[in-house]
Curated annotation (Swiss-Prot):
Keywords: Cytoplasm, Initiation factor, Protein biosynthesis
One GO biological process term: ribosome disassembly
Family: Belongs to the IF-3 family.
Cellular localization per UniProt: Cytoplasm
Principal location listed in the UniProt entry: cytoplasm
Residue ranges that the Swiss-Prot or TrEMBL entry lists as coiled coil: none
Keyword Transcription regulation: no
Keyword Protein biosynthesis carried by entry: yes
The protein's assembly and partners: Monomer.
Gene Ontology cellular component annotations, sorted alphabetically: cytosol; membrane
Protein's name according to its UniProt entry: Translation initiation factor IF-3
Gene Ontology molecular functions: ribosome binding; translation initiation factor activity
Amino acid sequence: MPAPQKDGPRANRDIRGVRDVQLIDQDGQNRGVVPFFDALAMAEEVGLDLVEIAPNSVPPVCKFLDYGRFRFNEQKKQNEARKRQKTVEVKEIKLRPGIDKHDYEVKMKAVQRFFEEGDKVKVTLRFRGREIAHQDIGLRLLERVKQETQEIAKVESEPMLEGRQMIMILAPR
């Protein structure tokens, strides 16, 4: 007797502790409630496996399937789902309090591109030397970034001072 399956639905003799099953044949037709061993014999007659589809229902629902092909298709679906899943990255844009107009526009285009790709953006404003005394200029700059991106992004972390840097994190809507 083979060891019970660790993953996926139970099949054939791995289905234990069941007297009757709700049977669905290979064409998808409901055969009603059938004794388990009769269902197993019918599956062997047609050369397919008896696979437990809904183990929690009473009686459990079983279907005639080619178990190898069924597991292959399930694995394929999981791999496709994994491929489609995108990990959210945090991209960083570094600004200075005295940034020029054109430089600011270039940085904002980059921010917009990051949001289109679905990434979060960490806006870092770095103060050098005596610039730290003029934090209000930095705060106004970050507020301007927030205003210009409010259509496409939401603020995940409000502007806050960490050492000589002011940081704000934005996430796409």
